[in-house]
Each structure stands twice: as C-alpha cells, then as structure tokens.
UniProtKB/Swiss-Prot annotation:
Coiled-coil annotated residue ranges, if any: none
Family: Belongs to the MscS (TC 1.A.23) family.
Protein name stated in the entry: Mechanosensitive ion channel protein 7
Polar residues bias spans: 9-21
Residues that span the membrane, as ranges: 231-251, 274-294, 313-333, 344-364, 606-626, 642-662
Function statement: Mechanosensitive channel that opens in response to stretch forces in the membrane lipid bilayer.
Region (Disordered): 1-49
Organism: Arabidopsis thaliana (Mouse-ear cress)
Gene Ontology biological process: monoatomic ion transmembrane transport
Membrane topology label: Multi-pass membrane protein
Gene3D superfamilies: 2.30.30.60
Amino acid sequence: MEFRKPFKSHSSYKQIISTGDQNEKTKKKKKLANLDDGDIAKTQSSGSSFDGNSYKFWQDIATDDYTKSGSFDFPQYREEITLDVNEETEETEDVSNNNNLSGSKETRVFFKINSSGTNNMSGSVRSCTSSTSFSSATMRLNLEQQLEDEGEVVVRCSSVRKTELVSRAKARSRLIDPPQEEEQQYSSWIGTSDQLRSGLLGRHSDDIEEEDDSSAEEDVPVEYRKLKMDAITLLQWMSLIALVVALVLSLGLHTWRNATLWSLHLWKWEVVLLVLICGRLVSGCGIRIIVFFIERNFLLRKRVLYFVYGVKTAVQNCLWLGLVLLAWHFLFDKKVEKETQSDVLLLMSKILVCFLLSTVLWLIKTLVVKVLASSFHVSTYFDRIQEALFHHYLIETLSGPPMLELSRIEEEEDRTQDEIYKMQKGGADLSPELCSAAFPQEKSGSTMNMKFSPIIPKTGSDNGITMDDLHKMNQKNVSAWNMKRLMKIVRNVSLSTLDEQALQNTCEDESTRQIRSEKEAKAAARKIFKNVAQPGTKHIYLEDLMRFLRVDEAMKTMCLFEGALVTKKITKSALKNWLVNAFRERRALALTLNDTKTAVNKLHHMISFLTAIVIIVIWLILLEIATSKYLLFLTSQVVLLAFMFGNSLKTVFESIIFLFIIHPYDVGDRLLIDTVEMVVEEMNILTTVFLRADNLKIVYPNILLWQKAIHNYNRSPDMGDEVTCCVHITTPPEKIAAIKQRISSYIDSKPEYWYPKADVIVKDVEDLNIVRIAIWLCHKINHQNMGERFTRRALLIEEVIKILLELDIQYRFHPLDINVKTMPTVVSSRVPPAWSQNPDLRRIILLEC
C-alpha cells in the first residue's frame, strides 16, 4: 500500500524526484486500476491492501476503543513514522500484516428467492473480510449483479453501525489525537499554514487582518483603509448634491425663498431631508477626520484606534441622530408648534431623543465589552501566544534549508564574481577554469532556488510581522490590532514544516504538510534532527543552529531543550520531547482561545439583551406609555421573575466573574480537585468539562468550582518531589552516609532532569527498627506532564535500589530476643508424666510449637 510520508518534499533542497520516477508511479497506479476480479482475490489472499475510503471508515471502530483506553498522556500511537526509506519499508510490511489480522468485518444478509416462484426461502449470513474499499466494492458489485440476474434481493443492514459510529465520534476528546484515517479524511477542513520564513509571521489573506508595521498605518487593517463605495453610499452622495443645489436655489431665488409647504418654508423641509438622508454620510466624514488625527499620534494609535474602529458605526449613528435632533429642534420651534397646534411635532421630538439615547447606550455597551475583552486577552494569553509563535517559527526554520549559511555563501560568490569582473575589465588574463568556477551555469528547472522562491504569499504592500517586532512586543506596548491578529494566527494556522511551501506546485496530499498529532510531531522531530545535525553526529550544537538562526535566536533556542544549557548540546530525545510539548501547548492554546471567544460572544449577547431591556424601559418612560398602574404591574412582574430566576442570575454572574476575572485554569491544564487529578477539556460560562485519567468526562458547574481549592500544575513553577526508602536500625552509619553521597552524586549527574544539591536526610524512625530515608529533589519541570515526572522518578528509584543492593542492604527480619517467665501449672490428664517434673523441657516444647 502507499505509505504516507508527512514531511517528504519532492522539491526540497536535499532530494529531487525526477520525471521518470513520477511516470513510473503513474504506470503502477494504472496497472492497479486495471486489475480484474481474479487479481483482486489474489491480492487479498496475499495480504496486500489498498488505501481506500472503506478501509478508513471501518478502521475507525477498531481504533476508537484503543483511543479511549489511553492514559493521561494519551499515548494512543505506539508506532512512529520514520523518514528513512528502509525504515519506512519495514514498517509498511508490519502495518500490512497487522491490518490483515485485525481487518474490519462487514456482515451482509442475503435472502434467496427461488426462481420457480415457490415460497421456499433460505437465508445465509456471510462475513467477508474487506481490507480495502477497492476490492470489497468490486466484489460487492459483481455479487449484486449476479444476484440480480438470478432474481435475488439484497438487503443491507447498516443502520446500527452508522448510529454507533456517530455516537462514538461525538464522545471523542479534543485533547486526544484523532485516528490517522480521520486525519486523512478531514484534512481539507484545516487551513494550511503560511510560512514564517525569514522571520515573518505567516497569515491568511482572507481570515487575518494584515498590517504594515513600518508605516504610519501599522495598526489599521487593509479593509479599514479602503473607502467602501456601495449603492447606498452612491445614492447618498447623489442626494447630497441634489439637496445642496435645491437649498442654494431656494435661498438664492426670491420666488422660492417665500415658498411654503404645509405652512412651512420650503428650505426648512430641504434642510430636514438633507440631515435625514445625508447626515450619516456627513458624520462618516467627520469620523474619518477624527481617525486621521488619532493615527498621527503614536500613543493614541497604539491604544485607542482599535476601539475607535470598533465603535465607529455606533459613533457615526450618534452624530447622525444628534444632527437630526438639532435640526428638528431649531427648525420646528415652539412658534411652529403653536401655529400648527399638533402633538405630532412633540412626539417626533421624543422619538428622536429615544433613538439618540438608545444609540448612546449601545455605544457604551460595545465599548465596554471590547475594552474588557481586549484587556483580558492581553493579560492572560499574550505571553503564551508569543512563545507559541516563536516555537512555530523555529519548527519551520529548522526544517528548511540553512538560509543564513546559503546567504553567506552566495554573498561570498557575489563578491568573488565582482572581483573577477573587475579584473577582466582591467585587462587581466584569467583562465577559463577560474571563470567557469566563479560563474556556474544555471540550475535545471527541476531544482528549486530557495532564495528567490515565492516562500511568503504577499498581498498589496503588507510585509507581515517580523520576529524582531514580535520579541519587542509586551503586554504594555502591544496594540489591540496586533493582539487580534496573533490570536487569529494561533486559532487558524496549524503547525507545519517548511516542506509545505516547497510542495505547493506538487500533487501530494495537502494533509501531509502539517503537524496534527503527536505521531507526526515525532516524525517532524526526526526530520529536523537530520536536517540540522552534522552527518554522523548524535547531537546538535550551537554552531549547527547558527546555520539557520541568528546568534540571539540560537542562544534562546538552546534554553528551550532539557539539559542543553548545561551540556551545550541537544539530543534527539530532547528535540522530540520539545516538539511534542510544543504541539500540545499549541493545541491547548488554540482550544482555549476558541472557548474564550465563544464565551465572550455569549457574554456579549447577554449584555445586549440587558441593554435592549433598558432601552425599552426608556422608550416607555419618555413616550409616557407607562402609566402608574402599568409601572406597578411591571414592578410586580419583575419581583415575580426575580423570585423565580434570581438564583439563576446570581449563578450566571458569579460564573462570569469566576471565568473572566479569577480564571484559575485554561484548556489542557492539569488540576487537582478534591484529590482527583483531571485535565481541562472545555470551558464554558456556566460549566467546565474535565477529563479524568481514564478518559472519563466530568462536568463541574463553575459556581461549585468557585468554592473548591484548585491545584493547577501547569501554572506552577518547577516542582519538587519526594522519594523515600527504609533501612534497618542496625545499619551502620557509614553505609547510610554512603547512601546519601551516592544518591546526591547521581542527582547531580543528571542536570537535565533535576536541580543539583538535593536533600537526602534521615526522616523518621518507625517501631524502633526501621529508619526512613527521604530524598527531596526539585525537577526542572512542573507536574503538568505527569508521565515525564514518573519516568524521571522511576530512574531515581531504580538507582536507589541499585545502590542498596551494592551496599548489601536488604529488607529482612533480624532475630528477636524472647524472655519466657515461670509458667503456671497445667492441670490435665493428657499431660506426660515428665512434664510437671521438668519445667525446662516444657519451655522447649512450647517454643518449638
């Protein structure tokens, strides 16, 4: 079968697949497509299989139970993809053998009807092992065609299986890697990642607002810089021109100046129409002028401009209604009201006031929600987003070619060519070999010039966010626009290697270019290690990183790997652990941002509902619709609603405070609540879903969590641990001192795991015969990754056992002294005659018994 190679690039700088290889693969595929039924049967019997939709569909049943039985670290994938061709071939054979043993079975029921028309009917149940969709579908079609020719009816019973699959799919956890077949099936749903090449953060032109940090409009997306000209705007401009011309003619011409309509001058009606129709257009121009002056001020542009654009429409409506109210008040004054003797003008004035107050309240509501949401996101997630994007940049940079080294080599070649050109221009006689070496021929079209290849898709004049700008950002100077863009990158862009851009022009599956599971993260780690490390070496050194990164970035990268800062080298296991942890953190952060966005939207809807109720009350009061009796009735209803839903409203309010203000955890955090360790699966306003060690989902109300002590492992610093062992009280002090010294030496020899100078003390004495020795040490990690913690703890326990055995310290009972006093005389007819005469013999017999 075809084996997925997630991170192989046909156009990478290390390996180029020729056209002949592609043609050969195409011929093989054509041969497979032309197989007849006999060949298919042979293929099934030989154990080979194809990669088809049916196989993927039914294999979900087998993988689902195994997924649910995973431990808290979710190690559902025990096999790892290797990137070497030989290793891939071996693993392919193993996988095909396993598939033949555990192939999914599909039950088909056939009811045979006699062609002679009799009522005799025989049913047969047949089970076929379908290893591929191609083979099973072909056999099914041939069999059904044969049955139809014989007059038989085929009945398929598949409703139960579909229902089971749907229920299982709903019960999966977001923190557990999906099955490999599901990843292939739904890979098109996940957007591809734009590259971070040359220190630029990638972005989607459709989903993520762009910005240019070097210009004065760095915090304004492109969509806000462009003037929108739609049909309504065009109609407003035409109406503005027509009404201005009519107003000028009405005031300039004597015959039109005294013209009246409904006892009012014509120019007053023109002014009212001008304000009503074109007032919003004029207020929009005023908003643009205000925004222009705000953009000129750096501080205001950083801190205020986002909120100005957020409430731009509400402010524009406020100005528009304010202009309408002013025009109505000054044009239709009390004199006009007395002349007309109508209540319509007063009613219209009240309606305009109600509209203005409603718009102002809506403006305040929108501004408050945006300010609170922005401050919450910056204070809570900025540091994690900054770290996650830097990890993304490292993954894509280290998986690609050494651009810094290639650029230095190319600069040296350019200087050499310039010198040779100057020498030739000066009349120097140079050998053809030197000229051919200095001016190499152009590479073939199949190769790829990595420097001039279109790595980063650009739109307009946007250049993205450089890593230097990202490092300079902090919670105080980051703008709301940048924070919004960074959040969208984390939510929408998945981790990927640099092969993704190199494969844009190939026909390889798009799903092979991303890191969507821990299995693919380990495969990417092996690829990065082979790409960065020198041939034949087992470690990555600082000099190797400097081929890809700048000096400051390389030094910062060395601090990310366990033990690299002390040993000055990066092992393959350390690189794999870092990449897996980076993938887990990125996935948890994306889920956290999605849940937070959903919670903020729900909160916004709640506040909008309350604001709408307040606006309705204001309308009723200003329009004098609510009389005293009506207000008394409303008050009684409010009291009744408060009695019925008061506790619910209190719960919602306290849950909002717990989630947004206290905020004790995020998605993916490991917590200890009531002596039970759980991982946060999903956050909502009213509830939180947890995942226990056995993958059991537990739903806690947030109001209940507010009253409990929450121990958060993920937010804790490097945590300590305790390991105890017991020796007998008769153990010599020299051996106890040797135990302390050897345990301390072992801990100091593992600087990548623990901090040095651990405490080894005699903790307690039990029953005057057991001495308890305690080892207090501090890990260089917290206990968020509980599997890694117990792995390191197991290494220490094994070393302690080894030390105790080498020092001949074992657990055994030492002899005890027993003092037997004078025993009472035994009165019995069954006592031997010598028993009462010899008490020493009696003691010996009792002791032996």
